[in-house]
């Protein structure tokens, strides 16, 4: 899993990885960083790597014994966004999940890797959730086709390489930018409901933007024309190429390797996310106001309940 280098495991070999996972499981169980679902005999162990990063180790319980199946690195999100509807589906090769999310502000359909797996498994049975009496996690059933509406999502991303760009010269007054964004949101919502006028206005707006870019690209550098971008990258559906303004910046130290990790909140096309990147993999000096450009693995935590990030708290589903 090469993406682990984003949170400070640049030179992690197989032997050290196995030892770290084993020690992390024992230590986390002792400290109570364990989530268990007794209906499915599944569980997760949280290994903290720095203040806001860690490893999410998923497995199954056989009695009191925890049997490791897979893990993934994660970072805690610092922002959240609203969405109209999400659907969640299991990956074929293991008991991990992808989320398809219609982000309400931008109208963009996002696909990301679900962080809080155990919260979702609990939500399947919950009376305020999907209300499923029976659920076979090993079989692809109808539960994955049930839309989940109006849940906040905290987007995060891991990057194994990127560069820092200077800000673009174009400056828009905050009040004017907010007004334009609000108007665009209204058009997007109306278009989703079938409003032909809204669809036509959005189409004309896109054509005008395309024509303007086609003329300017002949004389200007592409990164001086636009402030940010967010687009799919590669063959994996949760990989994106992003350019975004850095709104917040912190440095954290990996407790195991002592490598430095940059934690950035960036804004891409009015979409905020928290990004982790290893200092050794970043070209340039990051600073608030500058821009980050790189390929990211998009993750997200869905607030199935009012309290977010319950996947970091020890609890048990009876």
What are these regions (language model features)?
Residues 280-293:
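Short nucleic-acid-contacting surface segments enriched for D/E, G, S/T with interspersed K/R
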Residues 3-71:
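N-terminal ordered "arm"
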Residues 40-233:
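Long, hydrophobic alpha/beta structural blocks
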Residues 1-5, 309-317:
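Conserved small/polar residues in nucleotide/adenosyl-binding loops
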